[in-house]
């Protein structure tokens, strides 16, 4: 029987209920637990909201309650260099990035993991809803979280086998409701704290106002695919493929009462394309190209396989065929897909296992690129 007291686990604690219960469960299981709060954004921000200060107070209260030491570490430079610069570059290129995927890859499971090793960690743990399972050969497989509505493997799809070997996900087998019940029973200060949303580590800011501080918006024309001028857009970076709200055109043009959606972008001409109908033909595609292809365990350099995939968080899986060539892949859909968005992650699954994924570069319809950028 393993003596867990000799196994040191460093827990990434955000001041939320999930990471609080993660630390509690590991402590109850007898591990040598240390809590670490990551400060990744300057909280003396333009809105005067010091959320990190309050979050750290919650970390301290929880750590004191369960009896573990805790520290704070500053990764603001790493976050800026490895995540935020990427985030801005993607928007400049007319894409819609997913900073959470990059944040997990570069900060929570790289910068934080490296720091944890300096504290003598055997493992790191986070409050993500995912599971790890080691096979007889010692390979770690990442499985979906038991709570389908909270499963976060989509955001963890760029983790390497080396990172997974050092990672524990104590909440993976639990439902979110059970996590809150555990926190309440233990009297943790974060038991009723609402879940955070918004950009990874930056929080719930007015997105348009926030982004405009770093990227100057260029207004331009809003057009239909067949060339009708529909007015002015506020800046291409503020719109994503398939978006409905915020267009300001309602149903006033023509007799069709269907809602308007963003169906494409032309970065060189600064044109936003719009169309009516949720399944507008310009939104539909049957394949995509992806880069930064990465698998959570060893795979051949070139191979073809069938699996299911997600093209955005919380959407149902879709059947696909994947043709891998190094760090690039062509993904062919069994059924046409709506609003495949460059910059977002495509993530591959074999049943419960998350195999990895990549970043969407372009969607295609019958071999022709969609007018998405």
From Swiss-Prot:
Disulfide bridges in this chain: 103-200
Organism placement in taxonomy: Bacteria, Bacillati, Bacillota, Bacilli, Lactobacillales
Residue ranges, annotated region (Interaction with target base in tRNA): 98-100
Entry GO terms, CC: cytoplasm
Record-given protein name: tRNA-specific 2-thiouridylase MnmA
Record's keyword annotation contains tRNA processing: yes
Transmembrane segments annotated in the record for this chain: none
Entry keywords, A to Z: ATP-binding, Cytoplasm, Disulfide bond, Nucleotide-binding, RNA-binding, Transferase, tRNA processing, tRNA-binding
């Amino acid at each position: 029987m393993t003596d867990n007291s000799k196994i040191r686990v460093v827990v990434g604690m955000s001041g939320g209920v999930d990471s609080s219960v993660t630390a509690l469960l590991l402590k109850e299981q007898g591990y040598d637990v240390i809590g670490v709060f990551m400060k990744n954004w300057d909280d003396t921000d333009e809105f005067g909201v010091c959320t990190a200060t309050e979050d750290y107070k919650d970390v301290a209260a929880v750590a004191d309650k369960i009896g573990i030491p805790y520290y704070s570490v500053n990764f603001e430079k790493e976050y800026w260099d490895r995540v935020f610069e990427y985030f801005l570059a993607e928007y400049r290129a007319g894409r819609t990035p997913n900073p959470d995927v990059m944040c997990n890859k570069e900060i929570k499971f790289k910068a934080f993991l490296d720091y944890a090793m300096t504290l003598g960690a055997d493992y790191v743990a986070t409050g993500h809803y995912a599971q790890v399972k080691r096979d007889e050969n010692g390979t770690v497989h990442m499985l979906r979280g038991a709570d389908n509505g909270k499963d976060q493997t989509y955001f963890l799809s760029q983790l390497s086998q080396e990172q997974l070997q050092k990672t524990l996900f104590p909440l993976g087998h639990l439902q979110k409701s059970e996590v809150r019940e555990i926190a309440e029973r233990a009297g943790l200060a974060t038991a009723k704290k609402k879940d955070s949303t918004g950009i990874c580590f930056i929080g719930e800011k007015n997105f348009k106002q926030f982004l405009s501080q770093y990227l100057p918006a260029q207004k331009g024309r809003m057009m239909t695919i067949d060339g009708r001028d529909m007015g002015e857009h506020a800046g291409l970076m503020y719109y994503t493929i398939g978006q409905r709200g915020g267009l300001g055109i309602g149903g006033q043009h023509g007799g069709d009462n269907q809602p308007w959606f963003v169906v494409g972008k032309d970065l060189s001409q600064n044109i936003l394309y719009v169309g009516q109908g949720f399944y507008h033909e310009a939104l539909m595609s049957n394949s995509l190209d992806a880069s930064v292809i990465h698998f959570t365990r060893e795979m051949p350099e070139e191979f073809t396989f069938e699996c299911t995939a997600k093209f955005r968080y919380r959407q149902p899986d879709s059947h696909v065929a994947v043709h891998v060539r190094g760090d690039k892949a062509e993904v062919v859909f069994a059924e046409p897909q709506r609003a495949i968005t460059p910059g977002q992650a495509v993530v591959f699954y074999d049943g419960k296992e998350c195999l990895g994924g990549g970043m969407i570069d372009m969607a295609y319809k019958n071999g022709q690129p969609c007018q998405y950028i």
